[in-house]
């Protein structure tokens, strides 16, 4: 999982693109360069000469600070270069700096995570489509996908999903034809198929698997959790022999989703924060699969506590304080001896 490359795009507002670029340049100790163009872009180089960018996105609803009126300059999208796992900490620090500088998000903002698709093939891509489809309902609930943003991150296309699993493509060309439902649209940047939670248009046009289902946040821990989740899902698709697209049904969503996260490899202290963020919006009992078992355990613990309390009370009743021992008892005790 940790060997996969990735990139991230985080939409925000509250500050201008120029301000955001200066903040990032300040973090790296370099200079921001205005590029302009269609996306009114700024470029910032790091110590490895990688390019981090700030660009405009028309879907962002601009908001400004207290004393200024919002305009299109407040549409800010942060775009990372190709990153490795250790870069997550750098991304977190940049996010903290932007937030401290006045950046904020609203319900028009989203986060897109791209995972390198070069290690995938037609089989593993079918796996990842099915893995996502099976857990889609739980993912949308735990991530609280904003209803207003759902047109930009639609659930799996049932036509594509059914065809993918009935015909089982043997090569990437067949998969591409199924994705576009005919003629390829890989050269169309804004092809309509891109607006899905799992976007394979990005595979054919950019060489990345794009996850689009995250509401934007400037909480560094949440951003880290989203990246780790995407890397874990991609890794599971790579190592799993096959995957079913049958939707997961559960009467205890929190337990079911936690079990899945552990199966993905998000286990141990390293991923404790990720599990916390990814489970906090789900209902259920994290420790017991069956809610009835949880209730039964509560009753057992309550009965045990009651029994212990009663035993403690009985012990106290049978204990005679030292100052209440009679004189005869004291004499008897002092006369007792052992001869050798």
Where do the model's predicted regions map?
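Short, conserved phosphate-binding/catalytic loop or strand-edge motifs used
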Residues: 107-111, 115
């Amino acid at each position: 999982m940790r060997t996969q490359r990735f990139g991230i795009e985080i939409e925000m507002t509250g500050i201008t693109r120029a301000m955001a670029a200066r903040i990032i340049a300040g973090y790296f100790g370099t200079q921001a360069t205005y590029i302009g163009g269609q996306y009114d872009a700024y470029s910032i180089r790091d110590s490895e000469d990688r390019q981090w960018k700030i660009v405009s996105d028309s879907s962002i609803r601009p908001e400004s600070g207290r004393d200024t009126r919002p305009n299109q300059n407040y549409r800010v999208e942060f775009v990372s270069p190709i990153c490795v796992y250790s870069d997550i900490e750098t991304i977190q620090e940049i996010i903290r700096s932007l937030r401290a500088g006045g950046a904020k998000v609203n319900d028009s903002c989203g986060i897109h995570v791209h995972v390198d698709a070069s290690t995938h093939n037609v089989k593993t891509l079918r796996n990842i489509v099915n893995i996502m489809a099976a857990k889609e309902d739980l993912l949308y609930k735990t991530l609280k996908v904003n209803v207003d943003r759902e047109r930009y991150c639609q659930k799996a296309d049932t036509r594509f999903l059914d065809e993918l699993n009935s015909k089982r493509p043997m090569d990437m060309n067949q998969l591409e034809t199924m994705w576009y439902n005919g003629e390829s649209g890989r050269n169309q940047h804004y092809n309509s198929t891109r607006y899905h939670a799992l976007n394979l248009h990005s595979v054919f046009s950019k060489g990345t698997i794009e996850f689009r289902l995250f509401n934007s946040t400037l909480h560094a821990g949440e951003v880290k959790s989203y990246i780790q989740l995407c890397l874990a899902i991609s890794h599971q698709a790579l190592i799993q022999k096959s995957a079913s697209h049958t939707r997961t049904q559960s009467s205890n969503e929190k337990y079911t989703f936690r079990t899945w996260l552990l199966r993905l490899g998000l286990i141990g202290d390293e991923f404790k924060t990720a599990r916390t963020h990814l489970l906090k919006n789900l209902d259920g009992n994290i420790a017991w699969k069956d809610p009835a078992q949880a209730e039964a355990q509560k009753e057992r613990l309550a009965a045990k506590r009651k029994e212990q309390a009663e035993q403690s009370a009985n012990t106290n009743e049978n204990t005679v304080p030292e100052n209440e021992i009679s004189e005869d008892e004291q004499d008897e005790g002092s006369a007792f001896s052992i001869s050798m």
